[in-house]
Amino acid sequence: MPSLPPQRAAVLAFLQEQAQAGVSPSLAEIAQAFGFASRNAAQKHVQALADAGLIELLPNQKRGIRLPGGAGRDALLALPVLGRVAAGLPIGADIGLERQLWLDRALFSLRPDYLLQVQGDSMIDDGILDGDLVGVHRSNEARDGQIVVARVDGEITIKRLERGAERIRLLPRNRAHAPIVVAADADFAIEGLYCGLIRQG
């Protein structure tokens, strides 16, 4: 499934909730629900979702939005956005609930427990960009080579994990950034595994 901007993902979640209730909303109702100035903004999101294969549009019908396979609220996850994570130098652990998003389970490889907003460009070669919201599956264990959210001396970062015989390194995916070598006496912990993203804007 393609990455979705948060607002488009929210429109999809709204359509799924309405489908669960047996309702196919009109463009005017979608525009009203999201505070859009006109039906055209709703049409843009609906058409993009249809082009991505996430919904079906029945021609010449005011209420012609259908979900493939009848997906409903069971396909949704309520995910809290818990602050920022550095894709660059580690940033302070300012974890705290910012908001909550309803998102499709199929957006993620693992079931995420929360979302973090990426700050920085050190993971761009893995397709993780500044401003993206990344899904994090809580785990204190990870395999060599996995993308992890890690805590180093009270600060958090997202990097690829490299377990060496004598040391751990957190590897960026941008040649402009240097690896983070975890000192033997560092306060280090794996907070979770990266399991997908949605793109802002």
Swiss-Prot record:
A Gene Ontology molecular function term of the record: DNA-binding transcription repressor activity
This enzyme's EC code(s): 3.4.21.88
Active site per UniProt: 122, 159
Sorted UniProt keywords: Autocatalytic cleavage, DNA damage, DNA repair, DNA replication, DNA-binding, Hydrolase, Repressor, SOS response, Transcription, Transcription regulation
DNA-binding region: 27-47
Pfam families: LexA_DNA_bind (PF01726), Peptidase_S24 (PF00717)
Domain of life: Bacteria
Keyword Repressor among record annotations: yes
Keyword Repressor part of the UniProt annotation: yes
Function: Represses a number of genes involved in the response to DNA damage (SOS response), including recA and lexA. In the presence of single-stranded DNA, RecA interacts with LexA causing an autocatalytic cleavage which disrupts the DNA-binding part of LexA, leading to derepression of the SOS regulon and eventually DNA repair.
Quaternary structure note: Homodimer.
Record-given protein name: LexA repressor 1
Species annotation: Xanthomonas axonopodis pv. citri (strain 306)
Gene: lexA1
